[in-house]
Each structure stands twice: as C-alpha cells, then as structure tokens.
C-alpha cells in the first residue's frame, strides 16, 4: 500500500452497472446513472486533496463486465477499490445506507470510516458494515475493497433524496471524507460535507417533501408564503412524517 509522503494513493472508483445493465430500476430512474454521477463527484473531491490518483472502471454509460472491472484495478495496482451501488428490495419500506467488504482487516477498517462518514453526513438509517465473500468485485480484486450501497432506489424517500444533486454531493463528499480519515489526511471537504443545506423557497425543496410543505404553508402551520422559508433537511423529513400521520386513512 502507498505510504503518505512517498507517492499518491491510487484509488479505483467503480460505478456499478452501466450500458445494457441498468442495475436496479424504479420507473424512469436507473441505478447505473446514480452510481456514475456519485462516482464522478467522489473523484472530484479526492483529486482536490492532491493525495490521490483516480482510476475509473467506467466514465460513461457503457457495459463493463465484473471481470474487467477487477482487471482494471489489478493491472493498475491500485491501493484501494471503491464500488458505488444503489440498493433495492421487494419491501418498499427498506431504506438506509450500508457498506460491504471482504473479510480482510484493511477493507473492514476503511468500510467503518466510510460508513460512519456517510451516516453523519446524511442522517440516513445506519445499516452498518457487512462482511461478505459473495461479491465478485470484492473477492477478485487484489487490494482492499469496499462496496457502498448509498440508499434504496425502491424506497420513495431514499429515491427522492438520490435524485437531488446536493444529496449526491453529500454522499460523494462523505465517502471522500471517510477515505481521507482512514489515511489520516486533513481535508477541507469536512466543512462541505457537514454544512447543512437550507431550503428558502418551495421551488428548492425536493419533490418528496414539496407538497407537504406547500400544504403547511397554505394552512398557516408554517409561517411564510413559500418564498421566505428556512428549512433544513431534517425539518423536511419531520414535515413529511407529520403530514402523512394527520392524513393517514
């Protein structure tokens, strides 16, 4: 593994699926597009630290086999392999973020740093670090490897968050922060990742919460006319939960 001060850390970023393989699908939304967007953002954050060289398994919407993904990482002698995915389940209530890794010390340690940063940045349900030897890209790469499941495309609230460009920034920034923390690299991204977004107008609010907030404004439960709000993401979630509760049945 690269040593700090000797050379740059070489990180292979693997956006899951692509091309003829869309991955998990919910309506018009496909996993392959989310993974590529987040992967590119992750590369931007890591490269901004001047400590990392990035190797991609794909940078566009093309199909890359699992074997080729591993070969790219192995032939480039990468120090770590980070695979980005979006989860799916038959139960639409399933939600949250998890990080998977092979039974290997460095992989487990990196996974813990990444998972901690992701939950801290997003407030998502913590599904934890999971050990598995069933994923080809984890057991066929010759370096420590982790796979991030950054939310459930099958869960409406997770999906609405994943659609939001700022939320994708938080996911990518948190993964970058976890990697930097693992390598004990001080990073400017920590401020970016933890800085909460404030929604000032109805138009800025993600679709999953827009109707609930509008109703609250119309009834006077929220002061303002929809053009002078100051709502955090946590507030949006509470508003949606409250709206569903009072309107259930």
PLM region descriptions:
Residues 3-11, 20, 29, 33-193:
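Active-site-proximal helix/loop segments of hydrolytic enzymes
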Residues 192-249:
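Short, solvent-exposed alpha-helical surface patches in non-cytosolic proteins
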């Amino acid at each position: 593994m690269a040593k700090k001060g000797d050379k740059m850390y070489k990180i292979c970023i693997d956006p899951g699926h692509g091309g003829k393989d869309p991955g998990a699908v919910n309506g018009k939304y496909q996993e392959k597009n989310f993974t590529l967007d987040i992967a590119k953002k992750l590369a931007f954050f890591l490269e901004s630290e001047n400590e990392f060289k990035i190797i991609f398994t794909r940078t566009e919407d093309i199909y890359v086999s699992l074997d080729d993904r591993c070969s790219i990482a192995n032939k480039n002698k990468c120090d770590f392999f980070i695979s980005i995915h979006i989860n799916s389940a038959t139960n639409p209530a399933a939600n949250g973020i998890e990080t998977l890794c092979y039974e290997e010390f460095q992989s487990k340690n990196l996974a813990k740093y990444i998972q901690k940063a992701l939950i801290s940045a997003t407030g998502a349900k913590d599904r934890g670090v999971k050990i598995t030897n069933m994923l080809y890209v984890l057991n066929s790469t010759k370096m420590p490897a982790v796979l991030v499941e950054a939310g459930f495309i099958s869960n409406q609230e997770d999906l609405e968050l994943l659609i939001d460009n700022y939320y994708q920034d938080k996911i990518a920034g948190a993964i970058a922060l976890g990697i930097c923390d693992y390598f004990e690299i001080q990073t400017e991204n920590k401020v970016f990742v933890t800085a909460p977004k404030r929604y000032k107008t109805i138009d800025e609010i993600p679709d999953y919460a827009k109707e609930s907030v509008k109703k609250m404004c119309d009834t006077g439960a929220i002061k303002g006319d929809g053009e002078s709000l100051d709502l955090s993401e946590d507030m949006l979630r509470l508003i949606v939960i409250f709206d569903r509760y009072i309107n259930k049945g």
